[in-house]
Amino acid sequence: MNCSELLPPASVRGMRELQRAEFQKRVQVPQLRVPEQQVQRVIPLVKKFLLKMEHMHPVRAVDKSREILLHPMPIKAWESLPTEDLQKQQVTQENFSFVELELNYENWSANEILKSVLPEEEEGMTSYSRIGHIVHLNLRDHLLPYKQLIGEVLRDKLPNCRTVVNKASSIDNTYRNFQLELICGEAEYQVETKENGIPFEFDFSKVYWNPRLSTEHERIVKLLQPGDVLYDVFAGVGPFSVPAAKKRCHVLANDLNPVSFHWLQHNAKRNKCLSNIKMSNKDGREFILKELRADLLQRLRLTDTSSYATHITMNLPAMAVEFLDAFRGLYTDNELADISDAVVFPTVHVYSFAKGENTKALVRAQVEQNLASTLDEKQLQGISFVRNVAPNKDMYRVSFKLTRHLLTTSKEAEANNVRKRCAEDEKVDPEVAATKVKCV
């Protein structure tokens, strides 16, 4: 008997409308029939051969005996079993036989059902995300004709799944949240979920939340100690800010999306950390130029920055690097004149996508271009791979230290300095040098 006989019927291939009754089939499987009192001694001997399928117990009561169902792939005959050990328990070939089973839709997992239905020559459904009671898909074009069936199978098979949605388009709106298509279940998008042990609540249809970033959120939060400072420029519903505030860090969190801002406040209150967090609802650049600027200046002037760490998170990978120039010339020389040279400036963690061959080099170039500055070894704290987003498209975190020079020199002033240096090197008039490409 071939193991393929335990798979769903071949006739369901290509099914687009879920017909559960079509999955019925009858198969022959090996079994041992033993007296009830012997079961506890026999099971350990055949445990690795037990037939394990959804909603099917491998040991069935029949009168005063027990039928132990075995997997037909390794067990072709009595001789396939550990016969000597079984005979010591008074189990012989007479206890061995084949029995007919009726399998149906309930006996296969979601993965087994979908593999049997979806086109064999195309890539199947590789993954999905769980957010509370919602299952979030990102189906490729060739699977769209099967989306209704896929949704029904997942709702049937996944515990506590009530809503299945598909990503309807790329994230291109102002607030960077997913555009969703309901393909099965309830149009109920308010969810409760936990990330790294912390509860969050939000409307998934109106905010951005990606459970695949939970490990990255945890990495950053682990860097923080009580008393540290976190400026979260694109805070969303709080996956960085709320855990940091719970650790008794001083947090300034911001998000442009008013719905995200609402749930950020809700999650801070729910997690009882409101006393450690200040929240704002504005553009990230405005937040940097106002709230972050004022709070950081006060800390640089009035506190011992060597006694705590300051971090700035910028998790908006599609465009966060475009906000880095806001740090250039954030302060005047006079504002930082009385600050000790021993001051410890913040570490920025900026996230970005890069597409191409050497994505790590590309993402560094993006950061340096937007900063209008090369990051030396002392400044650059690391470039960390976060996840693969698509073929040849990766997400990275670039961590670097801000410096007095960056914070007091605007991009324009930096460009002028570069042009002057070029002019001096080439011993030509600065205005002439400024027209040359290599001096820009």
From Swiss-Prot:
Disulfide-linked positions: none
Gene3D superfamilies for the chain: Met-10+ protein-like domains, Vaccinia Virus protein VP39
Tree of life domain: Eukaryota
Swiss-Prot/TrEMBL GO biological process terms: mitochondrial tRNA methylation; tRNA N1-guanine methylation
Reaction catalysed by this enzyme: guanosine(37) in tRNA + S-adenosyl-L-methionine = N(1)-methylguanosine(37) in tRNA + S-adenosyl-L-homocysteine + H(+)
Localization in the cell: Mitochondrion matrix; Nucleus; Cytoplasm
Entry's Gene Ontology cellular component terms: mitochondrial matrix; nucleus
InterPro entries: MeTrfase_TRM5/TYW2, SAM-dependent_MTases_sf, TRM5-TYW2-like_MTfase, TRM5/TYW2-like_N, tRNA_Gua_MeTrfase_euk
EC number: 2.1.1.228
Broad EC category: transferase
Binding site for S-adenosyl-L-methionine: H217, D255, L256, D283, G284, N315
Keywords, sorted A to Z: Cytoplasm, Methyltransferase, Mitochondrion, Nucleus, S-adenosyl-L-methionine, Transferase, tRNA processing
Principal location listed in the UniProt entry: mitochondrion
GO MF entries: tRNA (guanine(37)-N1)-methyltransferase activity
Record family assignment: Belongs to the class I-like SAM-binding methyltransferase superfamily. TRM5/TYW2 family.
Oligomer and partners: Monomer.
Function as written in the Swiss-Prot or TrEMBL entry: Specifically methylates the N1 position of guanosine-37 in various cytoplasmic and mitochondrial tRNAs. Methylation is not dependent on the nature of the nucleoside 5' of the target nucleoside. This is the first step in the biosynthesis of wybutosine (yW), a modified base adjacent to the anticodon of tRNAs and required for accurate decoding.
Protein name: tRNA (guanine(37)-N(1))-methyltransferase
Organism this protein belongs to: Drosophila pseudoobscura pseudoobscura (Fruit fly)
